[in-house]
């Protein structure tokens, strides 16, 4: 029985990377732009039904909702060659189409006003699933719609589907001149901490660096970075779509990666990525080569000092025809060379999931790999966001845009900032051997001081 996953694409960024994701899945499953199987595609060798369903005319339709407050990106999808792929009833654009103006509070408020429209679509899609496992959300944490409306949807999803997995692919901002992105990021991260079971961190700075280095260009385009993101997304779901003996569902995949609920922010690495023909012609990919490269900082898609922190967990998804003996020998070599430093309080091991490559895509590499890792150095990314937030908050820059939407937003800022700082301390504590005791002591102190602390506050109501 399939464990279906519904994808929610929210905002400009969420729909752009979601669109690339579906193009990639169509290629890997032998599905054309209209949703029909190609003549060369063979039925029964994969599990398309995790992400697609078949309509009455037998064409494959993504289990996806396309949601935005302004029409530009969705209009481009509707006029592309893939326009016939999607269920038009699962596309929502706000009637006025003015967007959220890079304002989290505005996006949240509009999401609240469109609650019935959005969740009627979600409920219809969920009811059409035989055994729904969860939701996959693509969005940016720094804009207005992906952050604000995305936050609102996260909260309501958690309320309405408490037993379903929620995984997000969240794009973190680069160091741009958009001042308010720090406000939006802090408010969104609070919702990701509280409501997501797993968040795959997609750091714009690192994505641009990796694409630039591999393509040898100074200014990568948005399409090029989105293509990289779609590669990561498709690789991270390959064991669900081409199942083996392990990691056939999200629960199994996340169980070993996230030993403590709060530390659920995952970093990624992928190799080989080079499209330079000269490099491809001389490189010999092996399991050891792939696993070694996955641990190298230049291949990790987060701007964080991974050499100074510790791994809480690693799952390597290896694609290709691989002899299990090669896996064993590679793991032994990595241990001998001490290529990865693990926390002291958990199993110091790299989990391996073997997956088939799509038979419909030609590859010049025999072996490729994706690393999903829980690493304590991700706290540096959160610390940087806090530092940038504190600077603009001290100047009270553009705060009026937020207080205009809600008089309670300043209190919400303070709570969100405190929660993000707690997450930073949590990851730092995870580097220590007495982390379990630290966690117990913290809970004990919180219980004793409960009457003196701030009450939990949830922004907005249904």
UniProtKB/Swiss-Prot annotation:
Gene Ontology BP annotations: cytoplasmic microtubule organization; meiotic spindle organization; microtubule nucleation; mitotic cell cycle; mitotic sister chromatid segregation; mitotic spindle organization
Binding site residues for GTP: 142-148
Domain of life: Eukaryota
InterPro entries noted in UniProt: Gamma_tubulin, Tub_FtsZ_C, Tubulin, Tubulin/FtsZ-like_C, Tubulin/FtsZ_2-layer-sand-dom, Tubulin/FtsZ_GTPase_sf, Tubulin_C, Tubulin_CS
UniProt key word Zinc: no
Keyword Cytoplasm included in the entry's annotation: yes
Entry keywords, A to Z: Cytoplasm, Cytoskeleton, GTP-binding, Microtubule, Nucleotide-binding
GO MF annotation, one: GTP binding
Location within or outside the cell: Cytoplasm, Cytoskeleton, Microtubule organizing center, Centrosome
GO cellular component: centrosomal corona; centrosome; cytoplasm; gamma-tubulin ring complex; microtubule; nucleus; spindle
Family, similarity comment: Belongs to the tubulin family.
Its biological purpose: Tubulin is the major constituent of microtubules. The gamma chain is found at microtubule organizing centers (MTOC) such as the spindle poles or the centrosome, suggesting that it is involved in the minus-end nucleation of microtubule assembly.
Protein's name in the database: Tubulin gamma chain
Gene: tubC
